[in-house]
Structures are given as C-alpha cells and as structure tokens.
Amino acid sequence: QQVRRLEEMLGKPLFERSSHQVLLTEEGVKLLSYARRIIALNEEAHDALTGIWRDGVLRLGMPEDFAAPTTELLAEFSRAHPHLRLDVTSGLSADLHSAYAREELDLILVKQRRSQPPRAARPEPLLWLDSLAFPAIEQSPVPLAVFPLNGLYRDDLCQALDNLGKRWRIGYSSASLAALTAASAAGLGVTLLPASCRLPSHRVLGIAEGLPPIDSIELALYYRDGAPAATPALAERLKAFCGLV
C-alpha cells in the first residue's frame, strides 16, 4: 500500500506487475539507487554523530603492488582498533607523495629516489628486463613497457635509449606493476623494474646491450606527527612486513 501511495505521488509506476512476477520499472531502478545512497548517508551521519569512529580516521596510501599482499595485515590492524576508521588508497608513488604533501594522507608507503629522510626504508635494486622468447630490444623502434607519466623508472628508461641513439616507442603503458611485469615477459616491451619482479621468462639486459647500471630506488615509509595515535603501530606492522629499517 505504501508503494502504491509512492507511485501515485510520483505519477509513475515503480513496478511491472504480472500474475507470475513483479519487476522494477526503469523509474523503480532509479529510485532504488537513490534510496540506497540515502541509507548510506544516513548510516554515515549516524556513525559520525554517535562517535563510532571516536579514534579518528587514518588515511593510508601505498603502491598498487602492495595493496593485495597487505590486506590481511590491514584487516588484523582494523580488528585491533575497532573505533579507528582506516581509509586505504593505492596508486603511483608520485601521486601518493603529492597527496601526503597536501596532508590528504597520514601514512604512506612509497617507492622513491630520496628527497627527504623517511621513517624507515630499504633499497630496491632495478633490472632492465626483456622477453627471453621474444626480445623487444632487437626491434626498431624499441617498444617500451612503462608506467604512465610521472611513474617511476620511465624517465631513466627513455633517457638510456636516447643516450644509445636507439629509436623507441611506448609499446605498453600501465599503472600496474604486475601488468608491466607480464607485458615485458611476453615481448610487449623493454622495461625497468625492481629485481623482485624478474620472472623465469625474462631476459636481463645490461652492459652487453649498452644499457647502464641504474641506481637503486628505495621503498620508504612516512607518517606525519599529527596523525592518529595508532599510526605508529600500523607503521611498525608495515615496516616489519616490508623488511624496512
């Protein structure tokens, strides 16, 4: 009866009724979407006003390749801090650094060439990688598998080929480390990635191909002094998980 009243008020049918079934009309689907959003906002307002998140919000940023491996660690941390809301963002390290500088994130795990001292870090050696079965380095122009603009390693990769006088093109671009790893192994492009990404189907390039050694980057952890009280505890868990010192 309430649904009938609502249909009369809107002047539109919300359900298609037959003797066998009742289905939402297009207007009914739209209204359902709005109703869900209203309920979600109501629950959010309730949580904010009743103090369920009385320990605040901890905003964590990390590279995409660490998002899945750390889910269990983050879930355990959340269970240990039920009144702290944990918001997690994954993305390119350069973007995470920028968000941290704008104070949009409290704690970040990033790959970088050091610009300021982190709370903890460890080196990440880099390798030139190509496909063992389908070498991209032998093509002209040489296809490259790279992160998007502002992504790590991209400038090093392009500059090295420029210095060799080799023509190159972007053959594969992705913000996903896993995707770049697979693409280079399949022959879609030469890439420069952490040594930990090397697969059995990769060929390691180097001096024989005229490619220079590249200084290691570092995996670094930062958090701000004014972050929620539980931030150092999460930082210690991430530090242990990633082998940072």
Where in this protein do the model-derived segments appear?
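A late-sequence structural motif
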Residues: 69, 210-245
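Alpha-helical linker/hinge and terminal dimerization helices associated
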Residues: 7-10, 31-52
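A short LG(V/I)-centered, amphipathic sequence patch enriched
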Residues: 5-24
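Beta-alpha-beta core module
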Residues: 117-119, 185-226
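Secondary-structure junction motif
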Residues: 136, 143-165, 231
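Short beta-strand-to-loop elements that line the ligand-binding cleft
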Residues: 85-91, 167-176
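Short beta-strand-centered segments that line the small-molecule binding cleft or hinge
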Residues: 72-76, 93-130, 205
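Interdomain hinge and pocket-entrance segments immediately C-terminal to HTH DNA-binding domains
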Residues: 49-66, 80-84, 141-142
